[in-house]
Amino acid sequence: MKGFMIAAPASGSGKTTVTLGLLRALKRRGEVLAPVKAGPDYIDPAYHRAASGVDCFNLDPWAMRPELISALSSRMTESGARVLVAEGMMGLFDGAIDGKGSSADLARLLDLPVVLVVDCARQSHSIAALVWGFSQFRKDVLIEGVILNRVGSPRHEAMLRGALAPLGVPVLGALPRDPALSLPERHLGLVQADEHAGLESFLEQAADVMEAHIDMDALQTIWLRPKRYDAMANVARLKPLGNRIAVARDDAFAFAYMHLFEGWRRRGAEISFFSPLADEAPKADADAIYLPGGYPELHAQRLAGAPRFRTAIGDAAARGVTAYGECGGYMVLGKTLEDAAGVHHPMLGLLPLETSFARRKLHLGYRLLEPLGGLPWDMPLKAHEFHYASIVREEKADRLFRVRDASGENLGEAGLRVGSVSGSFMHVIDFSGEAA
């Protein structure tokens, strides 16, 4: 399978809009796509799916073993995809410590040519120094095209193209400034795709702009260059939480990694979905319940007023069914959740903690986890933490993980486990050892 990566010198350059527009434009042309998001972001993949009609996989070169990344790319090939379209994260060379885990690392690992999206709103000839520097910084990462974004006028475009001409890096197109091509945001990033009322119109408009201003034939030439993927379809995956896993999925629980579900299914697990916001219960025969992250703080009143959901989870826990929550799911397993207005809402009360979104503090970064029991994972794990909520009260209980940051600094113990119920603010991505 061929492919390419859309990357940028920095966040906010417009790579998400460009990626979405290209995905929709390529879909309209009949291409069978494999959308990919570099890094741990949960929100962009839902937009990728809306644009392409295909589930988007996160590929994280810091948190995932290279074997897993290769296996997932092979899985996309097996599904019939012909073009892998990856969106980078942050700036091309930005990652964890010393840039490790960057979009550039993913491009190198999968041998993807890079198309650099450059915000040109406040520059002209200086763009040549920027593009030259990026193209020379790592010889194992090939920048094979540039898309000029937020171009002010035909004269501005001519100046930019003239500055870049001596470098030999093809300019694939120039996109005019257009506020209508901006996506709405909130505290954890973009507003979720399912909540964007005009998303379909936005995607069609973005595709029209890409078709009108980008040389799609030149882009195709880039992704058709010779390459070869490793085939490691049988790489070890994280053990599933159970044999029949019920997963919460709606606007309050939207942050789940597709590669985990794919891996669990490959290991024989059955996965079903239910909506707590619709007051649905997990399947009665589920032997594990997974409450992923999301935005429970925006829906706390509805969750507090969902008796069927609340009773079913409580009864399942009493029977010894595994119930595991990450981030927002962890908050819902607790006793109370204070929303941004200071209103306290009763949660499931299965873990002895109280959380608050009114008392906000940013917690962000990659994490190295040592499990302390209560889950089927007995090997070191790699994870990501990103939330503003704070724990305001916590009673004594067994801890779930011993935690270090990406540099190895000890962050203490985190998470709670009581009986078959456990959770933490960490989003588990992969294991870091050799044992499965």
From Swiss-Prot:
Gene Ontology BP annotations: cobalamin biosynthetic process
Disulfide bridges in this chain: none
Keyword ATP-binding: yes
Active site feature: C327
Domain (GATase cobBQ-type) ranges: 244-435
Annotated pathway: Cofactor biosynthesis; adenosylcobalamin biosynthesis; cob(II)yrinate a,c-diamide from precorrin-2 (aerobic route): step 9/10
Catalytic activity: hydrogenobyrinate + 2 L-glutamine + 2 ATP + 2 H2O = hydrogenobyrinate a,c-diamide + 2 L-glutamate + 2 ADP + 2 phosphate + 2 H(+)
Feature type site, description Increases nucleophilicity of active site Cys: H427
UniProt name for this protein: Hydrogenobyrinate a,c-diamide synthase
